[in-house]
């Protein structure tokens, strides 16, 4: 999911996780974020939402603390920072990854290498990835592949204009108080310009992420080239 700043992404996802835990027995849910404090904050919001549910909708409480909770129906929710060992060895029905673009590339790669067996072993395991962009990194690659149906993720984009109270006048005021580049990153969710780069973002925009051309070692030509074609050196 590609969300603009302050569009209610955390509230929406936390509400879904709470609903899933209350109305499904014996499910395990993991809330992971780029920082442990952020993950605990999300769990705290979920706990607050639970406390405000009608009494008839609430389950009994087995355990309740800052890092996890367990309901009487056997459902468990835990929170942690995103790392290769965060959910290793566990069995989860839902894994929620918040601000995934802000996870360093090597940690994100190690995380999926360790957690993918857990994901693939469950027939109904859900992975929810939410973030604002931060350059052309692993999250950009996953998002770009999802748009081209090259993976099984479903891209969901929430535009800033869909939020009540945000219109053209609000956009002009926000740009005046910040900058156009900051607005493009935080509210237009442009991957380019979200981090400082040596090469101008307008040039990087032309370098679209593509799969590398496959080469046949036994031959001197590439397998993706088709004749006739023009090569410019």
Report residues per predicted region.
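Single conserved hydrophobic/aromatic residue that forms the stacking wall/gate
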Residues: 1-2, 219-233
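Walker A/P-loop
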Residues: 3-17
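Conserved Walker B
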Residues: 5, 99-103
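Conserved H-loop
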Residues: 6, 34, 132-134
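Conserved SF1/SF2 helicase motif Ia
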Residues: 20-40
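Inter-Walker segment of RecA-like/P-loop motor cores
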Residues: 40-93
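ASCE P-loop NTPase helicase motor core
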Residues: 48-52, 58, 102-178
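ATPase catalytic-site recognition across NTP-hydrolyzing enzymes
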Residues: 110, 161-219
């Amino acid at each position: 999911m590609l969300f603009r700043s302050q569009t209610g992404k955390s509230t929406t996802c936390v509400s879904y996780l709470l609903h899933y835990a209350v109305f499904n027995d014996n499910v395990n849910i993991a809330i992971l974020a780029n920082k442990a404090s952020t993950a605990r904050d999300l769990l705290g919001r979920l706990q607050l939402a639970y406390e405000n549910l009608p009494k008839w909708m609430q389950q009994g409480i087995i355990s309740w603390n800052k890092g996890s909770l367990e309901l009487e129906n056997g459902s468990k929710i835990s929170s942690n920072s995103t790392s290769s060992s965060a959910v290793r060895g566990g069995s989860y029905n839902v894994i929620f990854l918040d601000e995934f673009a802000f996870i360093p590339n090597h940690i994100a790669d190690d995380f999926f290498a360790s957690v993918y067996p857990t994901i693939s072993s469950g027939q109904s395991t859900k992975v929810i990835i939410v973030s604002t962009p931060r350059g052309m990194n692993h999250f950009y690659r996953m998002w770009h592949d999802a748009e081209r149906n090259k993976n099984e993720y479903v891209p969901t984009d929430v535009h800033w204009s869909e939020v009540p109270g945000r219109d053209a006048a609000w956009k002009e005021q926000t740009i005046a108080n910040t900058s156009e580049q900051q607005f493009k990153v935080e509210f237009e969710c442009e991957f380019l310009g979200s981090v400082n780069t040596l090469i101008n973002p307008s040039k990087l925009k032309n370098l679209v992420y593509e799969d590398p051309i496959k080469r046949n070692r036994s031959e001197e030509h590439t397998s993706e080239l088709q004749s006739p074609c023009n090569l410019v050196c």
